[in-house]
């Protein structure tokens, strides 16, 4: 009887230990075919620890990489697997699916180009997002969908949430490129590769791809429909733009979180930001 009790106790301990060490999974070389971009598009995905053992649907975070990286950046350098698993285990974040698209193949960036020849943003909203939310068990409603990203991807998360506030409950730009800070700067930047673009076309493109311009034109209700978390290091070369966005949101009395911590434009900074991002967006997932 003592031997039997000993075996039962050990099996129970082993079962409990295994349940606590259950981890999520990442896949970093997945792909889909895009008609809009006429190419195969790579993406990576994090599935939470209980995804394979349940039939439930999950909230989703679209997590955008920066310039020079691809869909593997947040996995290799951002340590998304260990950070997300730890946040879920600590109950600071809800189990969620994290999707990381590649925006570095063909042309770099998350937007349509000024001539409309490379339509990445159209691809994202018309093909990629519907494909992901059909392929995986995702709660496909605004309140269960968030977007975040770093640097170029921070700019993408700003613009996507400002272009489509009806789709995202939270937006978390980290060290974001907010777009040219003036029309003159935009002319210098865009004219280098688009010398035949007239002033009206250029100004319209600038207004649609500049966070400050979009904040000034969107209604208060539209801006308030998204929960904003903005984070940028005090030594980051993109600090000025993020600070101006913070001021613009304050002037319109838009609730938002603004973090300025000691740090620069680095993975060390972004890895430290990610747990707070996951907690912030989880609050939005839970508030309903």
Which residues does each PLM region occupy?
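Non-catalytic cap/lid and distal C-terminal segments of serine-dependent acyl enzymes
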Residues: 22-288
């Amino acid at each position: 009887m003592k031997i039997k009790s000993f075996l039962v106790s050990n099996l129970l301990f082993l079962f409990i230990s295994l349940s606590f060490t259950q981890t999520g999974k990442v896949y970093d070389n997945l792909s889909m075919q895009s008609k809009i971009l006429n190419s195969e598009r790579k993406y990576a995905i994090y599935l939470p620890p209980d995804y394979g053992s349940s039939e439930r649907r999950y909230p989703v975070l679209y997590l955008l990489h920066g310039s020079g990286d691809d869909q593997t950046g947040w996995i290799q350098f951002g340590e998304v697997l260990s950070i997300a698993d730890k946040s879920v285990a600590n109950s600071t974040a809800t189990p969620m699916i994290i999707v990381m698209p590649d925006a570095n193949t063909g042309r770099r960036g998350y937007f349509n180009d000024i001539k409309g020849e490379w339509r990445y943003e159209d691809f994202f909203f018309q093909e990629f997002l519907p494909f992901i939310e059909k392929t995986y068990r995702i709660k496909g409603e605004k309140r269960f969908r968030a977007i975040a990203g770093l640097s170029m991807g921070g700019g993408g998360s700003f613009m996507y949430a400002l272009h489509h506030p009806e789709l995202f409950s939270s937006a978390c730009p980290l060290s974001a490129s907010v777009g040219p800070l003036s029309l003159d700067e935009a002319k210098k930047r865009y004219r280098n590769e688009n010398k035949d673009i007239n002033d009206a076309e250029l100004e319209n493109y600038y207004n649609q791809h500049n966070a400050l311009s979009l904040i000034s034109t969107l209604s208060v209700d539209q801006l308030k429909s998204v929960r904003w978390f903005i984070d940028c290091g005090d030594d980051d070369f993109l600090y000025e733009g993020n600070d101006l966005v913070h001021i613009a949101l304050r002037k319109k009395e838009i609730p938002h979180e603004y973090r300025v911590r000691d740090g620069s434009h680095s993975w060390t900074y972004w890895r430290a930001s990610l747990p707070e991002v996951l907690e912030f967006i989880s609050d939005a997932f839970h508030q309903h």
